[in-house]
UniProtKB/Swiss-Prot annotation:
Domain of life: Eukaryota
Lineage, top ranks: Eukaryota, Metazoa, Ecdysozoa, Arthropoda, Chelicerata
Expression across tissues: Granular hemocytes, small secretory granules.
Name of the protein in its database record: Tachystatin-B2
Domain notes: The presence of a 'disulfide through disulfide knot' structurally defines this protein as a knottin.
GO cellular component: extracellular region
Subcellular location: Secreted
Amino acid sequence: YITCLFRGARCRVYSGRSCCFGYYCRRDFPGSIFGTCSRRNF
């Protein structure tokens, strides 16, 4: 089963384990592959 990550969860930008719908992996800093799940701004 696929679990998604909620806001504030640690994530990797290029990983299959992604943030929940409506969220995205915001990089810690430009060029980083690590980040934190944050709400998308539509």
